[in-house]
């Protein structure tokens, strides 16, 4: 059997060519043994039909084994030649052929190409960092918008409650109610200012 590892062929076929040839050899050898056993059985049956035959089954077995050794020797010689033919011409990948997964090695990169590729990688990394920062900023802004939206919702709820209170007290227009509230607030503020002034005047006198 060949001692060449043929690793590239094994990568392509999924098995080593030597393993393939070994299985073929074992299959042929098993078939040869089966044929010789069948021939031996036929000879023994023929001898049973011959009266006063001096040939014993032991002699037949010895002759069968000798013939088997003779056939096996010739078979080994023929198979050795067949193996060389298969491994050199059939199960071998030519040196100028590349497998699909090795096509990238057909045109190797130069130092300039490598530097260009390295620069592209750095640019992509910077772009990724920028996009990541932008994403984080957008998420932060989204959180702020959620807070503002919640506060706006609270304000609208408050105005709705004021509107309901005004309606319960006979004020159907919320704007009128708000204007009235502001006016009353100013009146109260004026009264408070007058009270404070009068209080100061009394203290001075």
UniProtKB/Swiss-Prot annotation:
Keyword Ribosomal protein carried by entry: no
Gene Ontology BP terms: attachment of mitotic spindle microtubules to kinetochore; attachment of spindle microtubules to kinetochore; cell division; chromosome segregation; kinetochore assembly; mitotic sister chromatid segregation
Subcellular location per the Swiss-Prot or TrEMBL entry: Chromosome, Centromere, Kinetochore
Broad class of where this protein is predominantly found: nucleus
Keyword Phosphoprotein: no
Keywords, ordered alphabetically: Cell cycle, Cell division, Centromere, Chromosome, Chromosome partition, Coiled coil, Kinetochore, Mitosis
Gene Ontology CC entries for this record: cytosol; kinetochore; MIS12/MIND type complex; nucleus; outer kinetochore; spindle pole
Coiled-coil regions, chain positions: 108-205
Family of this protein: Belongs to the mis12 family.
Function: Part of the MIS12 complex which is required for normal chromosome alignment and segregation and for kinetochore formation during mitosis. Essential for proper kinetochore microtubule attachments.
Subunit structure: Component of the MIS12 complex composed of MIS12, DSN1, NSL1 and PMF1. Also interacts with KNL1, CBX3, CBX5, NDC80 and ZWINT.
Cross-referenced PANTHER family: PROTEIN MIS12 HOMOLOG
Protein name per UniProt: Protein MIS12 homolog
Gene expressing this chain: MIS12
